[in-house]
Swiss-Prot record:
Catalytic reactions of this protein: oxidized coenzyme F420-(gamma-L-Glu)(n) + formate + 2 H(+) = reduced coenzyme F420-(gamma-L-Glu)(n) + CO2
Keyword NAD applies: no
PANTHER family assigned: 7-HYDROXYMETHYL CHLOROPHYLL A REDUCTASE, CHLOROPLASTIC (PTHR31332), FORMATE DEHYDROGENASE SUBUNIT BETA (PTHR31332:SF6)
Designated name of the protein: F420-dependent formate dehydrogenase 2 subunit beta
Cofactor(s) listed in the protein's UniProt record: [4Fe-4S] cluster; FAD; Zn(2+)
Organism: Methanococcus maripaludis (strain DSM 14266 / JCM 13030 / NBRC 101832 / S2 / LL)
The 4Fe-4S ferredoxin-type domain, residue ranges: 268-291, 320-349
Cofactor: record remark: Binds 2 [4Fe-4S] clusters.
Keyword ATP-binding: no
Binding site for [4Fe-4S] cluster 2: 290, 329, 332, 335
Keyword entries, A-Z: 4Fe-4S, Electron transport, FAD, Flavoprotein, Iron, Iron-sulfur, Metal-binding, Oxidoreductase, Repeat, Transport, Zinc
Name of the gene: fdhB2
Membrane spanning stretches: none
């Protein structure tokens, strides 16, 4: 692996970026040189809790995508496979986005040769409504007064309209049931090395982006962007590498701790799951939002049910989904996010996947091989 500190040479990008603007600079280079048809990224909607997927065709609009949006837990994998698969794209990806793209490529739903994946180091995301309640309770401010947020050094930091900042330790927030989504708490993949380039601020100097190269395609992109004057590049110090490694290791260990707590020590008893399944209204939200569930025709779909009959029994519906998808679950948490009756679906899928991993060694989104059931 190769490591670099990267900084955009564009003053407008530097003005809007959080740490060097490398991600936006890579996107600008790709668009300007017509190496891609568009860039898929997030931009802020009405406020910091509203992250909108944005397809950019003009590099002048890229500054609208600068900065982090930790309260917008969206997924790009199924967006690409369902709506943009014929385009040459550059896309910003969290680790779970990158994992979804890997799994979809194996199933011929995405052609990765058409993609440049620019990874973003990720410590987790916060549901927008949870974020608003959390800010009201723990920061004692109106959530509408927040103009910017970031996660840094174990704290959730907000900036207000008057220019002031407030911060609270994430540990304290999560002890009270707030903070990051529970699937993010359990996540072990913090640096998306399964993307072409992995970018972040861990271990970096102020005003620079720490970039780890994940592929030959990524190395070529970085070198060409430097050659064309879009970025400044220098080598990170040994201390920077050490700091980054320590942060990543600490985050991974924390994820394993939450796995033990949520999927073992405090995992719901069978009776509780009976209660959860009885809530299911068969809305198909979990199926439709899952980035790995790609079947064009679903045996459980409404079109395949006799008219006048009730939809599948909840246990049958969820059981078939579990047997079909658990071996490839990437722990993105989307199924749990959209469930209108608050069934903790991500817990059972993630737990099942970890059991499969113990038995087979297969890690979805990381291994190049197909899941064992496909062999």
């Amino acid at each position: 692996m190769s490591y670099y500190l990267v900084q955009s040479t564009d003053e407008d990008i530097l003005k809007h970026a959080e740490c060097g603007g490398a991600v936006t600079a890579f996107f600008k280079y790709l668009l300007d040189k017509k190496l891609v048809d568009g860039v898929l990224a997030l931009k802020k909607g009405e406020d910091v809790y509203d992250g909108l997927p944005y397809l950019v065709n003009d590099s002048k609009e890229l500054v609208e995508t600068c900065g982090s949006l930790h309260c917008a837990p969206t997924m790009f994998g199924n967006m690409i496979s369902k709506h943009l698969k014929d385009m040459n794209l550059a896309v910003s990806v969290k680790p779970c986005d990158a994992m979804a793209i890997v799994e979809l490529e194996k199933r011929h739903q995405i052609d990765k040769d058409k993609l440049y994946t620019i990874g973003l180091n990720c410590g987790g995301t916060v549901p927008p409504q949870t974020a608003k309640k959390m800010i009201e309770l723990f920061y004692d401010v109106d959530p509408e007064d927040v103009i910017k947020e970031e996660i840094d050094k174990g704290k959730f930091i907000i900036e207000l309209k008057d220019g002031s900042e407030k911060s609270v330790k994430i540990d304290e927030l999560e002890e009270e049931g707030y903070g990051r989504r529970t699937n993010c708490q359990r996540c072990e993949l913090k640096v998306p090395r399964n993307s072409d380039l992995a970018c972040g601020n861990w271990g970096t100097e102020k005003g620079w982006t720490f970039v780890e190269v994940g592929s030959e395609k990524g190395e070529e992109l970085l070198k060409n962007a430097q050659k064309e004057g879009y970025i400044n590049v220098k080598a990170p110090s040994e201390k920077a590498l050490e700091i980054r490694g320590k942060i990543e290791k600490s985050m991974i260990n924390l994820g394993k701790k939450f796995q033990k707590e949520q999927l073992d020590e405090k995992y719901p008893e069978p009776e509780k799951w009976d209660e959860y399944w009885s809530r299911c209204i068969k809305c198909y939200g979990c199926r439709d939002v899952c980035p790995i569930c790609f079947c064009k025709e679903c045996a459980l779909g409404e079109d395949y049910l006799d008219k006048g009959t009730i939809p599948p029994d909840p246990i049958m519906f969820q059981g078939i989904r579990l047997s079909h998808m658990s071996f490839s679950c990437i722990n993105c948490g989307q199924c749990e996010d959209v469930c209108p009756v608050e069934i903790p679906l991500a817990k059972i899928y993630h737990r099942a996947q970890l059991k499969i991993r113990e038995t087979t060694g297969f890690v979805p989104g990381i291994d190049d091989s197909m899941p064992f059931l496909y062999k």
